[in-house]
Each structure stands twice: as C-alpha cells, then as structure tokens.
Amino acid sequence: MPREIITCQVGQCGNQIGMEFWKQLCMEHGINPEGILEEYAQNGEDRKDVFFYQADDEHYVPRAVLIDLEPRVINGIQKSPYASLYNPENIFISKHGGGAGNNWGRGYCDAEKVQEEIIEMIDREADGSDSLEGFVLTHSIAGGTGSGFGSYLLERLNDHYPKKLIQTYSVFPNENDVVVQPYNCLLSMKRLILNADCVVVLDNTALTSIAVDRLKLLQPTFPQINSIVSTVMAASTTTLRYPGYMNNDLVGLIASLVPTPRCHFLMTGYTPLSLIDQKVTSVRKTTVLDVMRRLLQTKNIMATGAIKKGAYMSILNIIQGDVDPTQVHKSLQRIRERKLANFIPWGPASIQVALSKKSPYMESGHKVSGLMLANHTGIRSIFKVIYDQYRTFRKRDAYMNIFKQTKIFEDNLDEFDSSDEVVKSLIEDSAAAEKMDYINWGNDDDDMGYDPRAPPNFSSMQ
C-alpha cells in the first residue's frame, strides 16, 4: 500500500517547480485550485493521500513545506489562484527577506539559525502521516538558498529521519547562470552524494534545448521549462498515485534503479512531450515500441551529452496509457535485438517496465506516453564540468572572499576540500562502473566504506 511523502520546496527555483508540480497533481486528481475535489472525480481509484491530506472542511492540502529566504516567489504563490491550497503554517519566509545572495555559505548558515522552526513544520507533517515513507526535495544547486539551505536541510533530514527515504529533484544550472555557481554546485553535490538516496538530475541546458528543438519555443520562459519538469515529476510518481502490483512505493522505485549506494543520480527522458496550453502540432500513432525506442534517443534525454559515452546501470520505463503487456514484451525483445541500449558488463542488461494508468480527468493527445528513469555512467560528464570549473576558480581563489564572510568558512576552507574529495570520488566511481572488474574496484580504498556490489540497505527504511 502506498505510503505518504512530504515535499520540501527550497529557494526560488525549488518553489517554482514545486508550484508547477502541485498544479499538475491537482489536474491529474480532479482537485480544483482551492483544493476541492471536483464532482466528476468523487469516485476515483487514485491514491490522493500519498501527496495530499484532507483538512477538517475536507479540502485537499499538499503535504508540502515551502521555504525561501526572500519573499518574491512565495508571495506570488500566495497571490495565485492556488493560494488557499497550501497550509499557511507550512510556509517559511525569512524575516530579513534579503535572500542568500547566491552564496551557498549564507544559505547554509541561515538554515542553521532557523532549523528548529523548519524541523517543527516537518515534524508536524510527519505526525499527520499514517506511514511516512520519505521526503522529496525540490531545489536548484546554483544559487544560494536552494543550494545552501537545501544542503543543510538534507543533512538534518538524514539525521532526524535516518530510516526515511530522501529523493531530490535537483536543477543543475546553465553554464553562466551565477558567477560563483561552481562553488555552490560543488558544495551542494557533496550533500546530494552523502545525504540523499536518489537524485533526479534536471539539467537546465538540456531542458532549454528540448523546449527549443522539440516544443518549437524560440525563447522558452521559466514557467514553460518548469512545466516540463512538473511533467517528469508527475510521471515519476504516477505508480505511487495510481498503484498497481509493482513499483507502487518509493522504495521499490529507487531500489530497482540504484545498484550501488553512491551511484544514485538519475537522468530522465519523456515522450511525447507537449505543454498543457500548447496544441499538439504533430499527430502520430504512439505505440509501446515507438515510445520505448524514442526514450533511448539522445534528443529526448534531459541531460546534456550524458549518454554519448558510457553505459546504463539500470533503466525503468514508466509507460502510461492503455497498454497490452504482450506489446511490452515484444518491444523489449526488439530493443534487445537492435542493441539500442548499452549496459554495464557486470549487471543485468534489462529494461524494467512499470505500467501505469493515465489520469481519467485530463485529456491527452496521445494513447501512450512514457517516462524513462535511467542510471547511466555518462552522467558524470555533468559533474565533471562542475568539478573542472571549481578547480579553475579554486586555483586562483576567485571570489573566495564572498564565502569567507560566512561563519562556516571564516576559520578555514576545509569544507571545500572535503567536497572536492567526495565529488572527485563519485566521478571516479562512475567511470570505474563501466569496467568488468568494478566489483573489486576500491577494495583498497578505506574512504569508500562500502562494497560496490552491495545494494543500498532500503529494507531497513520502514
């Protein structure tokens, strides 16, 4: 039986994609912007209680905590048609309202100052759950609040709820979004590696390219990019909200995709893609084979250049629509025959498939749609760009004074050195995973602290 998940939205980007996610969920479950269930959705078979709970007046409230150090985005949410959807007690805006100034150190230290207030909100949500399974964090790793505050929150959640799963939807930036982003990204990466069980990488560069090339948007807006993200988030949770026999809880989804503890960074693909307010311009017949084949194409992968080299560790395709299971079997056979997916040599070379219902409350221009969640060694190319940019900055100590003004860096820069080691280790681990002798790799390295063959111990997370 599906269990509850609490969503934590941190920073400008985290709250923007969180807002789009809740809009999407409301539409898929027949809930109006005020949280009231529409007449036509009264007898649904969906599980709304995974992400929503019902207030005393029976309107649906997201199990969400909204956090930001500057008020603009959350104020916008509170003035939107969805203003009364959220629990006002679960909204935190810094009293100073100045933001974190794109400084990871400020975001991290500000989080430490208000941790009791935040944990109290989360505890209250957790206490209202019958059987809490875990947390979802939405944030960006480029700025100050999503990266710094988000990092501190990951550490605290890990300490405070050691047996609960933590999944993140983390936006990785375009190359020149923020001048100090190599520092912010590296420091955030350490926490994503050590304190999260699963990270869905949302590569802004790839998302923008997909919006231009596939949706034919000349200059994609933030809401349009965020709408693509919300489509991915909603599709990745569809088996939890419309449960079947398999993949109907978060632990099942993650365990099937994460073969070793550190290699828990996933890339995504989605097809056919369209925006809610966009007319479908190309009409084609969507079959299971067509969808599954397209999901493996580079142009549909939401991570820049990530699958040009390397190999898949695992693939889970969530296929939505009216699907005959025999078609799935035939499609998998065809993909195997054509060798469309290159897998690691030491693991099972198979694509897992989860079949899911489509929401009966939303019109779709396509009979079948699909989301791919994939663990691919090539994702390290994104991490290597961050790491190399960081090393270039660090050699010159560029902009380091900005960080030295914060408490965590006022005495030393050990946190940078520690993050450097952890990220470098992940990049090496990911490269080693492509070789047959990976199961013996790192045995002499005391810092690794785990057997690469051992799956994450999800069984204890009850």
From Swiss-Prot:
<dbReference type="InterPro" id="IPR002454">
    <property type="entry name" value="Gamma_tubulin"/>
</dbReference>
<feature type="binding site">
    <location>
        <begin position="142"/>
        <end position="148"/>
    </location>
    <ligand>
        <name>GTP</name>
    </ligand>
</feature>
<dbReference type="InterPro" id="IPR023123">
    <property type="entry name" value="Tubulin_C"/>
</dbReference>
<dbReference type="InterPro" id="IPR017975">
    <property type="entry name" value="Tubulin_CS"/>
</dbReference>
<dbReference type="GO" id="GO:0005813">
    <property type="term" value="C:centrosome"/>
</dbReference>
<protein>
    <recommendedName>
        <fullName>Tubulin gamma-1 chain</fullName>
    </recommendedName>
</protein>
<dbReference type="InterPro" id="IPR037103">
    <property type="entry name" value="Tubulin/FtsZ-like_C"/>
</dbReference>
<dbReference type="Pfam" id="PF00091">
    <property type="entry name" value="Tubulin"/>
</dbReference>
<keyword id="KW-0342">GTP-binding</keyword>
<comment type="similarity">
    <text>Belongs to the tubulin family.</text>
</comment>
<dbReference type="GO" id="GO:0007020">
    <property type="term" value="P:microtubule nucleation"/>
</dbReference>
<dbReference type="GO" id="GO:0005874">
    <property type="term" value="C:microtubule"/>
</dbReference>
<dbReference type="InterPro" id="IPR018316">
    <property type="entry name" value="Tubulin/FtsZ_2-layer-sand-dom"/>
</dbReference>
<dbReference type="InterPro" id="IPR036525">
    <property type="entry name" value="Tubulin/FtsZ_GTPase_sf"/>
</dbReference>
<dbReference type="InterPro" id="IPR000217">
    <property type="entry name" value="Tubulin"/>
</dbReference>
<keyword id="KW-0493">Microtubule</keyword>
<keyword id="KW-0547">Nucleotide-binding</keyword>
<dbReference type="InterPro" id="IPR003008">
    <property type="entry name" value="Tubulin_FtsZ_GTPase"/>
</dbReference>
<dbReference type="Pfam" id="PF03953">
    <property type="entry name" value="Tubulin_C"/>
</dbReference>
<dbReference type="GO" id="GO:0005525">
    <property type="term" value="F:GTP binding"/>
</dbReference>
<dbReference type="GO" id="GO:0005737">
    <property type="term" value="C:cytoplasm"/>
</dbReference>
<keyword id="KW-0963">Cytoplasm</keyword>
<dbReference type="GO" id="GO:0031122">
    <property type="term" value="P:cytoplasmic microtubule organization"/>
</dbReference>
<comment type="function">
    <text>Tubulin is the major constituent of microtubules. The gamma chain is found at microtubule organizing centers (MTOC) such as the spindle poles or the centrosome, suggesting that it is involved in the minus-end nucleation of microtubule assembly.</text>
</comment>
<dbReference type="GO" id="GO:0000930">
    <property type="term" value="C:gamma-tubulin complex"/>
</dbReference>
<keyword id="KW-0206">Cytoskeleton</keyword>
<dbReference type="InterPro" id="IPR008280">
    <property type="entry name" value="Tub_FtsZ_C"/>
</dbReference>
